[in-house]
UniProtKB/Swiss-Prot annotation:
Leader sequence residues: 1-29
An individual GO BP term: defense response to fungus
Gene name as annotated: PDF1.2B
Name of the protein in question: Putative defensin-like protein 15
Compartments where found: Secreted
Claim: Metal-binding is one of the keywords in the record: no
Keywords: Antimicrobial, Disulfide bond, Fungicide, Plant defense, Pyrrolidone carboxylic acid, Secreted, Signal
Pfam family of the protein (one): Gamma-thionin
Principal place of residence: secreted
Length: 80
């Protein structure tokens, strides 16, 4: 039993040691602002198509269909 406890303690210490050397990669987040798409017409039902249109036609970083009263609209996310 003592040998088993020693092995478990060694494994735990090794994991703590490896975790201490793990360097977290921090990328400064770029704040994105919402902007209704200027090129989308009608109700937005396909977020992937909205995303592609925002990126390719409007130079946005991202796009998705969001509910904005009274319907779903294509919203582009651009750097603030």
């Amino acid at each position: 039993m003592a040998k088993f406890a020693s092995i478990i303690t060694f494994i735990y210490a090794a994991l703590v040691l490896f975790a201490a050397f793990e360097v977290p990669t921090m990328v400064e987040a770029q704040k994105l602002c919402e902007k209704p798409s200027g090129t989308w017409s009608g109700v937005c039902g396909n977020s992937n198509a909205c995303k592609n249109q925002c990126i390719n036609l409007e130079g946005a970083k991202h796009g998705s269909c969001n509910y904005v009263f009274p319907a779903h609209k294509c919203i582009c996310y651009v750097p603030c």
